[in-house]
Swiss-Prot record:
Domain of life: Bacteria
Gene: tycA
CDD domains given in the database record: E_NRPS (cd19534)
Protein name: Tyrocidine synthase 1
Pathway, per record: Antibiotic biosynthesis; tyrocidine biosynthesis
Family membership: Belongs to the ATP-dependent AMP-binding enzyme family.
GO terms of molecular function: ATP binding; ligase activity; phenylalanine racemase (ATP-hydrolyzing) activity
Organism listed in the record: Brevibacillus parabrevis
Extra information: Tyrocidine is a mixture of four cyclic decapeptides, tyrocidine A (D-Phe-Pro-Phe-D-Phe-Asn-Gln-Tyr-Val-Orn-Leu), B, C, and D, in which Phe, at positions 3, 4, and Tyr residues are gradually replaced by Trp, depending on the relative concentrations of these amino acids in the growth medium.
Keywords assigned by UniProt, alphabetized: Antibiotic biosynthesis, ATP-binding, Isomerase, Ligase, Multifunctional enzyme, Nucleotide-binding, Phosphopantetheine, Phosphoprotein
Free-text function comment from the UniProt entry: In the first step of peptide synthesis this enzyme activates phenylalanine and racemizes it to the D-isomer.
Domain topic, free-text comment: One-module-bearing peptide synthase with a C-terminal epimerization domain. Each module incorporates one amino acid into the peptide product and can be further subdivided into domains responsible for substrate adenylation, thiolation, condensation (not for the initiation module), and epimerization (optional), and N methylation (optional).
Alphabetical list of Pfam families matching this protein: AMP-binding, AMP-binding_C, Condensation, PP-binding
A Gene Ontology BP annotation from the UniProt entry: antibiotic biosynthetic process
Length: 1088
């Protein structure tokens, strides 16, 4: 009975999917576009950054270029290369090629040169369309055909009418190159009819109309761009091209979609996981494609819009099946790939190409109008993959190599790959191609590449190899990077003595070992604590670093620790009546070593109420010396989220205690006799403002929150206070707590203290306990007073020769700029962000520093020097380095748990002349950083506090134009059991300079402000600049150069087998690097 029912289902399905749905069968892509241009001539067709074209304008420009191509010999099925940056011109070029009768081949300019060269040669393209900024690359790869540089073509005088060239739906439209098993990419040939069918499908299934605004997210070399481009342009809708900078910044991406009111977007699921539905309210359809989606991701989005999961290889005109998440179902448990789209046939077959019944696993094969013509110049592969369709005589069927099965509801479940092809971050990758590249290396005898899954269910590539001679992972990575695009590079390379085999003597891929992320690093066995002090340190390290198991011989740096977290360790020791200097932890980075420096202390910091005048610290004097416009609007802020909601009364009780506890938060600033006086008001008056808003009926929660937070930012009053603003936003899906504090009284470490106190106090209040916060350390007032004394002591004045030497070496050479404009305002500031992947960040934090015993700042600055050497062509550069400013310079002082603005600023000279070899430059940077006395804290004290007669010949003439600051793992401190970082990050977006929320009318205080922090396990670097001084392209070049050099440093350090020490690691004063190298070489020769 059940078998008969299954047969009925299968028969019904076959009948349904072979029914023809009408579409524009006799028309080509450009004809369908021309119909839209005629129907909607004045509607916006395409938008990129600040430029837009109407359908009429886009059509006319494409017609003009098409006529030029005809004169150059383009005709039916001619192959034309399109090698351009993502832009409006890119789309014009594609339409022009189609109108002239040709087929376009998109070539990604970021591909390795070998791959670009191969695609140009293999496709036999006689013409390449490009832009001036890319034209040199076309020539550099050895292309000898005709190059048409669109920027230089005189097209305006040409006829703008449609060409009406003869065309057929079976003409070639485009050739997409994808990964191939032979080690070379293969070109898939697609015809017009497949896209003509999609036009009808878009309108029938998605209801796409001229009212829609559709995003172009994908790279133009990826077939998803064809889907996005023609979904809009064949329906009269507007196409919005997303820049790489917007795509690489999740917050900017969300803002762009909302601000431009996009209605349809197609994204890889791996990208969508970083977005928040409430922040993109204009979307009506979300489509995921390129790799498998997940039930949690679907459930997160499906009730906010139409969620579509799409599947389809390049060989079938992009899309073969879709599945729409049911809106009437509370949650989904799995995500199938759905049912075939119109005029597309799906067959699940066995090895003999016989149909399998519902529930049986088999190979997924595809037929229908979207099928590709085959592979360019690969008749053998075409015959293998495009076989005669046994179910429809006279037609072909594409064998995908995917494993799938029909479900009883008529949908298809995707089960993975039969062969060794995978999809990672939306890219279909033939593992055999990577293996072939590795096997071409002269020292590699065997190579296997597989896709593995990390703890976050994300996929990565891992290469295993056997080599007869020494071939390190770093060497292989460099070699592969010259042959393969970035998305095909394995994340890890593992050397094996032999490959695991199955009983049939085939490589057992399932038995390949997981990569050791700490490969080539010394890994001591676990050593438990032996004393009470060691046990306390282990507990504190586990809490601060977020690591469950830590032994007493584990290295603080290797566990990802940095100087800011070292301060947190010191602060938490204070609650055990134990004292440790931060420098001791940094110098002796294992618990076994540093426990010897931990001392009991009976001295307790004053826990009473502080009031009265407080001397300005150096950084505060710097601030008032700048005479910024709107000094009241120079804040830092955060937004916290609690799904269960916050109790307003509890929040106020906790804030009352926090403001009472931390004296700096009660400051005001008066002008007396031409001077700024900092005054602590004690407990009198309004010490903070609290606001509560009920947004449960608000349709746009994000907009409401961001509007109010900006109002609060601009309402600070330095003279009268308060300088703390708190706002509670209650919504249907949890509450959001906004905290804004003027920068004069808070810094990055202060925020960590406040988050901890807020969590502690809130938990106590919820449990019905009295609020009792951890003890504070010495007051901000005491610290400032001690600095006044320290400023003229011999200990500090002994630093003067170092700073005098730096001034004498520094040449005041201006940073190159695109526009020589001064007095720029914050409203002109733009941000560009780059990110490292989590695995790259982990390598930087936990492994890279072991090679040369460096700190993270050493490596970040080494990369900065290499980037500026490449970008600026200067011989040297002086940067302003920002530090936390809580150095151990005053013996009796303990400010590890004190709130206030402690930041130090000091100049660092980077030599840009001798940047090779890489190992020497890393060591040189480290040694130069170690020579800076006391982490640079003394420089600003000398400048702003020391008596002029005690400053020697210091002139403080050095005026760096670049500021660099690494903030550490900031967002981890916002995650507690009670609250997390809010997805409404308007208040978290610290502002135009990458750190602070400043008045738009405030002056830009540095030409380039570079800020690094760890966010969501990723290193994020923000490059802030004024658009009145720099073009976006210039900063993009700098940021990309920085990322390239930083990754090279990480790779170099993590693959280094031996730890190499430098003079600063030893106590011999005056030892030079060259002398130490000689000593080590002598030792090595002696021991041979």
């Amino acid at each position: 009975m059940l078998a008969n029912q299954a047969n009925l289902i299968d028969n019904k399905r076959e009948l349904e999917q072979h029914a023809l749905v009408p579409y524009a069968q006799g028309k080509s892509i450009h004809q369908l576009f021309e119909e839209q241009a005629e129907a909607f001539p004045d509607r916006v067709a395409i938008v990129f950054e600040n430029r837009r074209l109407s359908y009429q304008e886009l059509n006319r420009k494409a017609n003009q270029l098409a006529r030029a191509l005809l004169e150059k010999g383009v005709q039916t099925d001619s192959i034309v290369g399109v090698m351009m940056e993502k832009s409006i011109e890119n789309v014009i070029a594609i339409l022009a090629v189609l109108k002239a009768g040709g087929a376009y081949v998109p070539i990604d300019i970021e591909y390795p040169r070998d791959r670009i060269q191969y695609i140009l040669q293999d496709s036999q393209t006689k013409i390449v369309l490009t832009q001036k900024s890319v034209s040199q690359l076309v020539h550099d790869v050895g292309y000898s055909g005709e190059v048409v540089v669109l920027d230089e073509e005189q097209l305006d005088a040409r006829e703008t009418a449609n060409l009406h060239q003869p065309s057929k739906p079976t003409d070639l439209a485009y050739v997409i190159y994808t990964s191939g098993t032979t080690g070379k990419p293969k070109g898939t040939m697609l015809e017009h009819k497949g896209i003509a069918n999609l036009q009808s499908f878009f309108q029938n299934s998605f209801g796409v109309t001229e009212q829609d605004r559709i995003g172009l997210f994908a790279s133009m070399s990826f077939d998803a761009s064809v889907w996005e481009m023609f979904m809009a342009l064949l329906s009269g809708a507007s196409l919005y091209i997303l820049s790489k900078q917007t795509i690489h910044d999740f917050a900017a991406f969300e803002h762009y979609l909302s601000e431009n009111e996009l209605t349809i977007i197609t994204l890889p699921p791996t990208y969508l996981t970083h977005l928040t539905p409430e922040r993109i309210t204009s979307l009506r359809i979300m489509i995921t494609a390129g790799s498998a989606s997940s039930a949690p991701l679907v459930n997160k989005w499906k009730d906010k819009l139409r969620y579509i999961n799409a599947y389809g290889p390049t060989e079938t005109s992009i899309c073969a099946t879709i599945w729409e998440a049911p809106s009437n179902q509370l949650s989904v448990q799995s995500v199938p790939i759905g049912k075939p789209i119109q005029n597309t046939h799906i067959y699940i077959v066995n090895e003999d190409l016989q149909l399998l019944p519902t529930g049986s696993e088999g190979e997924l094969c595809i037929g229908g109008v979207g099928l590709a013509r085959g592979y360019w110049n690969r008749p053998d592969l075409t015959a293998e993959k495009f076989v005669d369709n046994p179910f429809v005589p006279g037609e072909k069927m594409y064998r995908t190599g995917d494993l799938a099965k029909w479900l009883t509801d008529g949908t298809i479940e995707f089960l993975g790959r039969i062969d060794h092809q995978v999809k990672i971050r939306g890219h279909r990758i033939e593992l055999g191609e990577i293996e072939s590249v590795l096997l071409a290396h002269e020292h590699i005898t065997e190579a296997v590449v597989i896709a593995r899954e990390d703890q976050h269910a994300g996929q990565y590539l891992c290469a295993y190899y056997i080599s007869q001679q020494e071939a390190t992972p770093a060497q292989l990575r460099d070699y592969a990077a010259q042959k393969l695009p970035a998305y095909m590079l394995p994340s890890y390379f593992v050397k094996l003595d032999k490959m695991p085999l199955t009983p049939n003597d085939k490589i057992d891929r399932k038995a390949l070992p997981e990569p050791d992320l700490t490969a080539n690093q010394s890994q001591a066995a676990y050593h438990p604590p032996r004393t009470e002090t060691e046990s306390i340190l282990v507990s504190i390290w586990q809490n601060v670093l977020g690591i469950e198991k830590i032994g007493i011989r584990d290295n603080f740096y290797s566990l990802g620790g940095d100087s800011i977290q070292a301060i947190q360790v010191v602060a938490r020791l204070h609650s055990y009546q134990l004292k440790l200097e931060t420098k001791d932890l940094l110098n002796y980075p294992t618990i076994e070593q540093v426990a010897l420096f931990v001392k009991s202390t009976t001295r307790k910091s004053d826990q009473g109420i502080i009031a009265g005048n407080v001397p300005l610290t150096p950084i505060q004097k710097w601030f008032f010396g700048k005479n910024f416009t709107n000094t009241g609007h120079w804040n830092q802020s955060s937004v916290l989220y609690r799904p269960e909601g916050f109790d307003p009364k509890v929040i106020q009780s906790v804030m009352d205690k926090i403001i009472e506890h931390h004296d700096a938060l009660r400051m005001v600033y008066q002008h007396e006799n031409g001077n700024v006086v900092q005054h602590n008001r004690g407990l009198g008056g309004q010490l903070y403002d609290f606001f509560s808003y009920n947004l449960t009926a608000q349709p746009d929660v994000q907009q409401a929150i961001e509007a109010e937070t900006q109002r609060l930012h601009s309402s600070m009053n330095l003279q009268e206070g308060p300088l703390v603003k708190v706002a509670l936003f209650q919504t249907l899906h949890g509450d959001h707590l906004f905290l804004a504090i003027h920068h004069l009284v808070v810094d990055g470490i202060s925020w960590r203290i406040l988050f901890e106190d807020l969590a502690t106090g809130y938990a106590q209040a919820l449990a019905g306990q009295a609020i009792s916060l951890p003890e504070k350390t010495d007051s901000f007032q005491s610290w400032s007073q001690w600095l006044q004394e320290y400023a003229n002591e011999a200990d500090l004045l002994s630093e003067i020769p170092y700073w005098e030497s730096l001034e004498s070496q520094a040449k005041n050479v201006s940073l190159p700029k695109d526009y020589e404009v001064t007095d720029c305002k914050q409203k002109s500031v733009r941000n560009m962000r780059i990110r490292l992947h989590p695995e790259e960040t982990e390598q930087l934090l936990k492994h890279a520093n072991q090679a040369y015993q460096t700190e993270i700042n050493d490596l970040l600055l080494a990369a900065l020097g290499l980037a500026f050497a490449e970008w600026s062509k200067l011989a040297q550069i002086v940067i302003h380095l920002e530090g936390h400013g809580r150095e151990d310079i005053i013996e009796q002082a303990n400010v590890a748990r004190t709130v206030g603005w402690f930041t130090s600023q000091y100049p660092v000279l980077l030599d840009l002349k001798q940047t090779a070899p890489l190992s020497d430059y890393i060591k040189l940077t480290k040694e130069n950083m170690r020579k800076i006395p006391r982490k640079g804290i003394g420089y600003d004290i000398l400048k702003h506090v020391t008596l002029p007669e005690n400053r020697g010949s210091l002139s403080f003439r050095v005026q760096p134009e670049v500021t660099f600051n690494y903030l550490g793992q900031f967002d981890a401190d916002m995650r507690t059991e009670l609250f997390t970082r809010s997805p409404y990050s308007g208040g978290n977006t610290l502002g135009a300079d990458g750190k602070n929320n400043l008045s738009p009318e405030s002056e830009v205080y540095t030409a380039l402000n570079i800020t690094g922090l760890i966010e969501g396990g990723e290193l994020v670097l923000t490059f802030s600049y004024s658009s009145e001084q720099y073009r976006e392209e210039s900063i993009q070049q700098l940021s990309q150069s920085y990322q390239k050099h930083l990754l090279a440093i990480i790779a170099h350090c993590t693959e280094k087998k031996e730890v190499e020490r430098t003079p600063s690691d030893f106590s011999v004063k005056g030892l030079q690097m060259e002398e130490m190298d000689d000593i080590f070489e002598l030792l090595a020769n002696t021991l041979r």
